[in-house]
């Protein structure tokens, strides 16, 4: 069995879920805001994402000059941010653990086949889902 979308009862798995996160000394309103900020090489620019909603951060992240190593570092950054989200919020960690051994799939209709899976075609690498399952395993091992 699988969780196919990070909505409804599973909305907390989404990076757009409103939960504060401290990352590299800056507190953001969501994991998405933290992630989008990391596209900027300059800390002052990253700080501008701190008060943005997830939607506004995603929009702003599409307008910044991306750091030159972004493609090489984005997976590691995402994993660190998602780990921070769940370790900083024990109630969210408990909810993640409650998914047991369900496969976590970031199914979407916007054709993101890197972080998720296109629900129309079933294609996708599902990197966000894989990160969540790794973090779930880490949390389970720590209990």
Where are each of the predicted segments found?
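Charged, low-complexity intrinsically disordered segments
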Residues: 1-143
């Amino acid at each position: 069995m699988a969780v196919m979308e990070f909505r409804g009862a599973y909305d907390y798995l989404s990076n757009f879920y409103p939960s504060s996160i401290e990352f590299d000394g800056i507190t953001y309103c969501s994991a998405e805001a933290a992630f989008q900020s990391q596209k900027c090489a300059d800390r002052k620019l990253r700080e501008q994402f701190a008060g943005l909603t997830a939607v506004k951060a995603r929009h702003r992240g599409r307008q910044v000059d991306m750091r030159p190593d972004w493609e090489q570092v984005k997976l590691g950054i995402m994993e660190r941010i998602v780990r921070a989200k769940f370790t900083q919020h024990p109630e969210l960690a408990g909810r993640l653990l409650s998914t047991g051994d369900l496969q976590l799939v970031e199914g979407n209709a916007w054709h993101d086949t890197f972080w998720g899976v296109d629900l129309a075609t079933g294609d996708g690498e599902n990197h966000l889902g894989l990160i969540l399952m790794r973090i779930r395993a880490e949390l389970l091992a720590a209990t």
